[in-house]
């Protein structure tokens, strides 16, 4: 349980906290001297049942509001202090606005300094406070009258705080901690502290430290000021860490993460909760957890907007941010992350805005995955980071729906059906325009039909279609099941007459027609039909090899690729003992069909599934 204090400067937050816990949370000499909290202070209150309630004492002065914002991320409850003599003040409202915009935690009110006012003033302040709370959405907050220096109301407040229910945190999430302090301890080394927003951490784990961009090993843990082997979301945690980083490398706003993050977000799409009007492309101060950057807002529609950061932030879906004016005097709005994936164009298209509104309303990770998958292939690593899902949770989620998965990508059944239509239509057109070929290889079909889609998914879909009988294949060549070539009776007789002429060397159509004493056009038609049936293969127009020779050439290329990393014309020519021109024709044929690809003078193996008798 983590409770944050809130309230106007000099309303007795630190004094009451000391009365509750016995600890003065002001930790800086300047704070002691001024009598006000400047930075975040912490106090821990052990309970008889073994629990430890942690308090974050935030500054009340407007000048130090950025520090206050760093303290309210990840809290379970807020304790609002209002001095009876002053009543509700500017920073009281400011703190309530910030608490509302960062998730509206449950709230308790302590009226402080009650010994300084009479009953009439106390009644007046109670009414003022309850009306103010109602304005900000707290309709049933419990209120206590206290005078910390006299001990009035302190025990009743203690009893109430002890009975507060702990906030539950989702299971199966990655560990994520926002760093708010870093220091060194003699004999232990580097220590960082912060509030864990999700997941759990164990002694011995390796975490990724942003800012320093390096992995760090967890040597020791304190949770809620108690030594432990394991700590969880919702706790104040101190981590003794070691690795390639020093105290000087760490800043407030850095993160300790269970997984190395993707690139930090330069822009995100959010929903807004406005307390004041926002203008298009208005400059802002933007607060997230312990981070504070500047940026601008691009308004999209209703409460949807895009935030563009001057300094990138490590964000996840549903993270909350607070937007303040560029002079840092007014809290303007809260924002909740809808998606980290922001297209450069088309953000205001009705279809995309409808998707964003649905996504903003998604209640579960399964709902979010379904919506993303309705628009295109989903990269599971990207989705897993955005939702902060552990590997096990992500696997379970991806396996719970009707999805096609391959190599870290996921495709919905509806989109898979659409892709299948494209593949079949492309293959039908290929048969029409390349009647002399049995069909393309899977890589070539992918590049023709779905060139911009994730390769593993397309190839997995092609394989599924092959297994289901929607596609047929021979030696890796794909064709429609109905695409079958055959000889007429006269052509069959002619083929039987000439097939014995095909030895190890290729034939030109005109030469073979002359040799057999047949018309050239009739011979050309016959050889095209023979090629469709896989008996022969054209390396260039009208020049044919017996098909088993092409298979032998493919095996040679595999050998050269394995031994030398690539095939060059000279090696290929020498191995076959043929002329350079013929060697180049053969290699260019393999490039053309996608078995190899050319890089300078080299030919690299591309689709090894071709010329495979098992396929």
For every predicted segment, state its role:
Residues 10, 16, 35, 57, ...:
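Residue-level signature of catalytic and energy-coupling elements of molecular machines
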Residues 5, 106, 117-121, 128-131, ...:
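C-terminal effector modules of nucleic-acid-centric enzymes and ribosome-associated factors
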Residues 58-63, 72-96, 100-124:
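Conserved Switch II/interswitch segment of TRAFAC-class P-loop GTPases
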Residues 83-84, 108-123, 143-152, 297, ...:
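G-domain G4 guanine-recognition motif of GTPases
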Residues 61-62, 85-89, 104, 113-118, ...:
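Conserved nucleotide-binding/hydrolysis micro-motifs of P-loop NTPases
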């Amino acid at each position: 349980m983590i409770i944050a204090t809130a309230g106007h400067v000099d309303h007795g937050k630190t004094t009451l906290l000391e009365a509750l816990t016995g600890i003065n949370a002001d930790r800086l000499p300047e704070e002691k001297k001024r009598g006000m909290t400047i930075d975040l202070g912490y106090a821990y209150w052990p309970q008889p049942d073994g629990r430890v309630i942690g308090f974050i004492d935030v500054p009340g002065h407007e000048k130090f509001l950025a520090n206050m914002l760093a303290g309210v991320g990840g809290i379970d409850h807020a304790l609002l202090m209002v001095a009876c003599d002053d009543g509700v003040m500017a920073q009281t409202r400011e703190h309530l606005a910030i608490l509302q915009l960062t998730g509206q935690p449950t709230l308790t009110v302590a009226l402080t300094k009650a010994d300084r006012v009479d009953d009439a003033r106390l009644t007046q302040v109670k009414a003022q406070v309850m009306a103010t709370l109602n304005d900000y959405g707290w309709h049933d907050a419990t209120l206590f009258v206290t005078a910390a220096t006299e001990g009035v109301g302190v025990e009743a407040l203690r009893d109430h705080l002890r009975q507060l229910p702990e906030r539950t945190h989702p299971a199966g999430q990655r560990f994520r901690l926002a760093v708010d302090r870093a220091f060194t301890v003699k004999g232990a080394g580097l220590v960082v502290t912060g509030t864990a927003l999700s997941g759990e951490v164990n002694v011995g784990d390796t975490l990724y430290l942003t800012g320093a961009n390096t992995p760090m090993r967890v040597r020791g843990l304190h949770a809620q000021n108690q030594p432990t082997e394991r700590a969880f979301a919702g706790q104040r945690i101190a981590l003794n860490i070691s690795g390639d980083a020093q105290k000087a490398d760490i800043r407030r706003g850095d993160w300790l993460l269970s997984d190395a993050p993707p690139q930090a977000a330069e822009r995100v799409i959010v929903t807004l909760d406005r307390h004041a009007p926002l203008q298009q492309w208005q400059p802002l101060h933007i607060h997230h957890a312990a981070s504070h950057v500047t940026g601008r807002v691009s308004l999209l529609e209703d409460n949807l907007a895009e935030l563009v950061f001057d300094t990138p932030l490590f964000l996840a879906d549903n993270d909350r941010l607070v937007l303040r004016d560029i002079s840092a005097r007014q809290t303007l709005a809260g924002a909740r992350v809808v998606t980290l994936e922001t297209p450069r164009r088309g953000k205001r298209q009705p279809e995309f805005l409808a998707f964003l509104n649905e996504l903003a309303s998604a209640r579960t990770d399964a709902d979010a995955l379904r919506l993303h998958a309705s628009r295109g292939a989903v990269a599971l690593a990207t989705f897993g980071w955005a939702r902060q899902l552990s590997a096990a949770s992500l696997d379970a989620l991806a396996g719970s729906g009707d999805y096609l998965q391959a190599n870290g990508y996921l495709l919905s059944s509806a989109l898979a059906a659409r892709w299948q239509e494209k593949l079949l239509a492309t293959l039908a057109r290929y048969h029409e325009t390349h009647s002399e070929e049995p069909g393309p290889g899977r890589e070539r079909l992918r590049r023709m039909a779905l060139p911009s889609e994730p390769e593993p998914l397309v190839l997995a879909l092609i394989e599924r279609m092959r297994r289901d009988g929607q596609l047929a294949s021979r030696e890796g060549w794909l064709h429609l099941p109905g695409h079958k070539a055959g000889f007429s009776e006269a052509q069959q007789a002619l083929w039987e007459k000439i097939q014995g002429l095909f030895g190890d060397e290729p034939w030109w159509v005109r030469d073979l027609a002359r040799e057999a004493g047949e018309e050239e056009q009739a011979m050309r038609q016959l050889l095209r039909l023979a090629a469709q049936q896989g008996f022969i293969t054209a390396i260039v127009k009208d020049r044919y090899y017996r098909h088993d020779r092409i298979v032998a050439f493919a095996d040679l290329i595999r050998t050269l690729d394995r031994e030398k990393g690539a095939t060059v014309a000279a090696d290929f020519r020498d191995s076959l003992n043929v002329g350079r021109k013929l060697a180049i024709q053969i290699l260019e044929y393999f490039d053309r069909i996608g078995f190899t690809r050319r890089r300078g003078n080299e030919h690299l193996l591309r689709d090894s599934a071709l010329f495979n008798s098992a396929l």
